[in-house]
């Protein structure tokens, strides 16, 4: 049997091979080996969140590595460092009071009670974002500040943002946490000017420990609001207060966002969240079904997950639809019933939800450009403009992410899609011919 330090070193190498750098830093570097005795391994972790994550996601590797090194199963045990403190032990004996305080603080911070780390399903598309969120929640204002999540609609950016707020309030019940959408920030700023309460507005936003701002891209063209947010950002950052932002695209791809803000957003960590793969979609549905106490066979969940691949909101909406269909018809939930329930949804989707390929085909026919050229690399104007219009329409008329759109045009980078979108926007403002052509193509796509 190896000693605990050499066994831990082997484990570190095993995890380093399968985890991203932020995940490795979040889970492995924060863990301390205590004892290895009689095939039992004791590890000290910094929080209950870390313990839960280890138990759910990382324990199997301990058993696997132990078997390789010793020929026997090594069983892990986790000790939370803070639970050694008598003060915390006393708090754990009185959970009801703590829950009330937590609930009141969460409501005051405008946090959604459903959006916690416990309800978040981890997959390949969000693993790094989840790890970074946990790091920030456990140690705000230090490593990743600001933390910037970006990705398409309904992929979990807001969920992670709220989860950070909840966890910080669990760790620091007296912390001042504020969640706000960019629209609300703008409206409150304008109102403070009209009512001459600007100083009160600044105190509210600059005297917080954690500021969560959703959909920051909508501030891009609001000059006065951006100026106010710039100073708010600086004040909080200089005081080592944590800032978390979300957007549908990376900071440097947000049109008309001032360079001074782009550079500040880059001071921390920017993480993209991509659509969930099939396994993650099934796990999301299982978690939702368990929360709703629904009895659904695995093959039925797999069927539903196979029908919806766009985002988590639509996926959960499909499950609600199946549940309602079963209740109305007084039937058990089966794959056959799910197919009937989602039939009309797919029918509506086929009419109203365009694919990138449909847009490409329509543009190809309209301009008499071969589809392979539209997706290819030819740079002649008769092909470049239709290609840019295709990218523009894909951005405007679908929920696909920038990388996804780029991939459908011969593997182009997402910055190419951004450039195409901006180029066509500019042409639409001054070129009547382009206005007419884009309008006609839109009508064809909507007909």
Swiss-Prot record:
Localization (cell): Cytoplasm
UniProt-annotated stretches for the region Domain I, interacts with DnaA modulators: 1-74
Signal peptide segment: none
GO MF term (any one): ATP binding
InterPro entries the record matches: AAA+_ATPase (IPR003593), Chromosome_initiator_DnaA (IPR001957), Chromosome_initiator_DnaA-like (IPR020591), Chromosome_initiator_DnaA_CS (IPR018312), DnaA_C (IPR013159), DnaA_dom (IPR013317), DnaA_N_dom (IPR024633), DnaA_N_sf (IPR038454)
GO cellular component terms given for this protein: cytoplasm; plasma membrane
Keywords on record: ATP-binding, Cytoplasm, DNA replication, DNA-binding, Lipid-binding, Nucleotide-binding
Binding residues for ATP: 154, 156-158
Classification via PROSITE patterns: DNAA
Pfam families associated with the record: Bac_DnaA, Bac_DnaA_C, DnaA_N
Region (Domain IV, binds dsDNA): 327-447
Region annotation (Domain III, AAA+ region) ranges: 110-326
Chain residue ranges for the region called Domain II: 74-109
GO BP terms: DNA replication initiation; regulation of DNA replication
Main location: cytoplasm
HAMAP family xref list: DnaA_bact
Comment block on domains: Domain I is involved in oligomerization and binding regulators, domain II is flexibile and of varying length in different bacteria, domain III forms the AAA+ region, while domain IV binds dsDNA.
Subunit annotation: Oligomerizes as a right-handed, spiral filament on DNA at oriC.
Family per record: Belongs to the DnaA family.
Function of the protein: Plays an essential role in the initiation and regulation of chromosomal replication. ATP-DnaA binds to the origin of replication (oriC) to initiate formation of the DNA replication initiation complex once per cell cycle. Binds the DnaA box (a 9 base pair repeat at the origin) and separates the double-stranded (ds)DNA. Forms a right-handed helical filament on oriC DNA; dsDNA binds to the exterior of the filament while single-stranded (ss)DNA is stabiized in the filament's interior. Strand separation requires the DnaA boxes and adjacent DnaA-trio motifs as well as ATP.
Listed name of the protein: Chromosomal replication initiator protein DnaA
Species assigned in the record: Enterococcus faecalis (strain ATCC 700802 / V583)
Primary gene name: dnaA
């Amino acid at each position: 049997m190896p000693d605990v330090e050499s066994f831990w070193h082997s484990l570190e190498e095993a995890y380093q091979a399968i985890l991203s750098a932020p995940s490795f830093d979040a889970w492995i570097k924060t863990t301390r080996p205590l004892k290895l005795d009689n095939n039992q391994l004791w590890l000290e972790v910094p929080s209950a969140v870390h313990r839960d994550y280890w138990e759910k996601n990382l324990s199997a590797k301990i058993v696997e590595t132990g078997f390789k090194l010793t020929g026997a199963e090594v069983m892990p045990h986790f000790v939370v460092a803070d639970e050694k403190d008598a003060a915390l032990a006393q708090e754990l004996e009185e959970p009801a009071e703590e829950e009330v305080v937590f609930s009141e603080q969460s409501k005051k911070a405008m946090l959604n009670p459903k959006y916690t780390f416990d309800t978040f399903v981890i997959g390949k598309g969000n693993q790094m974002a989840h790890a970074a969120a946990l790091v920030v929640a456990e140690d705000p204002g230090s490593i990743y500040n600001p933390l910037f999540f970006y990705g398409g609609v309904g992929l979990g950016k807001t969920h992670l943002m709220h989860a950070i707020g909840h966890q910080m309030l669990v760790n620091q019940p007296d912390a001042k946490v504020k969640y706000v959408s960019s629209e609300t920030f703008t409206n409150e700023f304008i109102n403070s000017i009209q009512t001459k309460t600007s100083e009160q507005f600044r105190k509210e936003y600059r005297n917080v420990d954690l500021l969560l701002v959703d959909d920051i891209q909508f501030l891009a063209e609001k000059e006065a609001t951006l100026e106010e947010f710039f100073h708010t950002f600086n004040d909080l950052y200089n005081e080592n207060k944590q800032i978390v932002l979300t957007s549908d695209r990376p900071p440097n791809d947000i049109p008309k966002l001032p360079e001074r803000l782009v550079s500040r957003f880059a001071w921390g960590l920017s993480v993209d969240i991509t659509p969930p793969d099939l396994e993650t979609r099934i796990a999301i549905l299982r978690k939702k079904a368990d929360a709703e106490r629904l009895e659904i066979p695995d093959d039925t969940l797999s069927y539903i997950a196979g029908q919806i691949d766009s985002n988590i909101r639509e996926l959960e909406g499909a499950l609600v639809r199946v549940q309602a269909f079963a209740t109305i018809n007084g039937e058990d939930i089966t794959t056959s019933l799910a197919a009937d329930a989602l039939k009309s949804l797919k029918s509506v989707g086929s009419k109203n939800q365009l694919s990138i390929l449909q847009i490409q085909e329509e543009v190809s026919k309209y301009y008499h450009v071969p589809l392979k050229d539209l997706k290819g690399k030819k740079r002649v104007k008769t092909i470049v403009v239709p290609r840019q219009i295709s990218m523009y329409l894909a951005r405007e008329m679908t929920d696909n992410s920038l990388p996804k759109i780029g991939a459908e045009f011969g593997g182009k980078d997402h910055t190419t899609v951004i450039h195409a979108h901006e180029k066509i926007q500019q042409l639409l403002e001054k070129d009547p011919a382009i206005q007419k052509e884009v309008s006609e193509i839109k009508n064809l796509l909507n007909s």
